[in-house]
Amino acid sequence: MAYDSRFDEWVQKLKEESFQNNTFDRRKFIQGAGKIAGLSLGLTIAQSVGAFEVNAAPNFSSYPFTLGVASGDPLSDSVVLWTRLAPDPLNGGGMPKQAVPVKWEVAKDEHFRKIVRKGTEMAKPSLAHSVHVEADGLEPNKVYYYRFKTGHELSPVGKTKTLPAPGANVPQMTFAFASCQQYEHGYYTAYKHMAKEKLDLVFHLGDYIYEYGPNEYVSKTGNVRTHNSAEIITLQDYRNRHAQYRSDANLKAAHAAFPWVVTWDDHEVENNYANKIPEKGQSVEAFVLRRAAAYQAYYEHMPLRISSLPNGPDMQLYRHFTYGNLASFNVLDTRQYRDDQANNDGNKPPSDESRNPNRTLLGKEQEQWLFNNLGSSTAHWNVLAQQIFFAKWNFGTSASPIYSMDSWDGYPAQRERVINFIKSKNLNNVVVLTGDVHASWASNLHVDFEKTSSKIFGAEFVGTSITSGGNGADKRADTDQILKENPHIQFFNDYRGYVRCTVTPHQWKADYRVMPFVTEPGAAISTRASFVYQKDQTGLRKVSSTTIQGGVKQSDEVEEDRFFSHNKAHEKQMIKKRAKITN
């Protein structure tokens, strides 16, 4: 087959249009390039296609689908299908610097007798041979099965589901949300259990990977696995770390079982970074390069649409999903646009700096986007799927309050603007989903947290970690004091797991699914407690509670231990960097 000259002609035409308009449309370029490349699947081995070579008949050193398959960002008529070719996943992937065609199929049945969509996508070295197929033309609220093929190799089969049509009457949905899965701190048994649930969707709220070198961040119950490299800095580093996490069988099973909607927190790049401001010990210029590498690796390993393709150190990740008329999900990015943490970060008393009315956590554009979505929503529930503690959370005393400068408490003016907007629209159906803090919490959301008699406009469900922090316990040494100082907080638990939510038009039920340990595989899972919120001003109501067998009843840990552990990890990193410089 002769080389198809339309590719070069199309690229030249796009360049001319871009120069004339003084703009460059990345999305148009990528979509167009994919279409033109698709014309060339019959090329001979290693024949050139534009700027890259295509290996149309690949032979692999070992099985290329080592990282499994995933789906995500579902809409009512489409879903993203993901995989990455990586026969040697922990050493850069083990692929040649050639593009490889990957066939994909979507079927109504798991035996692929009723195939409804199929095509070919190019796995390119520029994106670590990852594939992001936006499979469209699908029916609303339907289960589908998908798979990939390249050369003579066939991927595992994944199962996914489209969203109901916008505005459709939906009687119920069930989903889970998870966060914080430090690989060294434990085994991903929670995902083994999650994969067996009957779910429509999974949300991941951040800290999908951790950036630390081996045994820099150590849990109270000890590290039981080891990171595969020193602190990650470069694109290759981040790719290998994602691959290590993605190689876990339980995580792969959960990805293959349901569509996921993901957002990041800080450890996908580094601890507590704010916008383009890093931790101490590195320049802004070096950090911007690091952030760009981290963002690209994140995109390469997540089932995201091309609208989220990074542009250097920037990436569009906040987005909106509607589940019929039942729920409107606003997936936030509280990391990329925020002002620097006040008071030099950490857990501190409030100050003039933290109270500055101009401080932002979301950035102006995202804040306005959120208000537009909340203001126009006609859904039964308005959801903020995000990273950090939203409710006021004093873990000091009334006389000497202490707040996390990294959470919404460090940006009270931003929280007040959100609450004031909710108040102006007279909403009482707001649910905030949160990760980050490695423990389970449940809070009533008041228009004024200082007055528990003030209107309740919603509830916050904070999910515990998958592994981060180690085994945990039923309660901590500071639990009773925190609950006393924060009467709007109704529940705390420190075991590991995830949250399962069952939603109907009139009721939101959250089940806290936890395990007694993660430092060994095989832990059983139980529902520690279930809470219901019903939009009737009575707030959260506990409807069940269970004692977890086989775990620690109370630990000597307190909230600030998590902050101290990260500080110790950073100190270890700085010692290594100083030693490297002096040597």
From Swiss-Prot:
* Top-level division of the source organism's lineage: Bacteria
User: Which residue intervals are annotated with compositional bias (Basic and acidic residues) in the record?
Assistant: 350-359
What general EC class does the enzyme of this chain belong to? hydrolase
- Example GO molecular function term? alkaline phosphatase activity
CDD domains named among the record's database cross-references: MPP_PhoD
**Family designation:** Belongs to the PhoD family.
- List the PANTHER family: ALKALINE PHOSPHATASE FAMILY PROTEIN (AFU_ORTHOLOGUE AFUA_5G03860), PHOSPHATASE, PUTATIVE (AFU_ORTHOLOGUE AFUA_6G08710)-RELATED
Q: Which reaction does it catalyse?
A: a phosphate monoester + H2O = an alcohol + phosphate
> Could you tell me which residues belong to the region Disordered?
339-359
Post-translational modification summary for this protein? Predicted to be exported by the Tat system. The position of the signal peptide cleavage has been experimentally proven.
Q: What is this protein called?
A: Alkaline phosphatase D
Residue runs in coiled coils: none
N-terminal signal peptide: 1-56
Give UniProt keywords alphabetically: Hydrolase, Signal, Stress response
**What does the record say about induction?**
By phosphate starvation.
- The gene that this protein is the product of is phoD
The EC number(s) attached to this protein equal: 3.1.3.1
Q: What InterPro entries does the database record attribute to this sequence?
A: Metallo-depent_PP-like (IPR029052), PhoD-like_MPP (IPR018946), PhoD-like_sf (IPR038607), PhoD_N (IPR032093), Phospholipid_Metab_Enz (IPR052900)
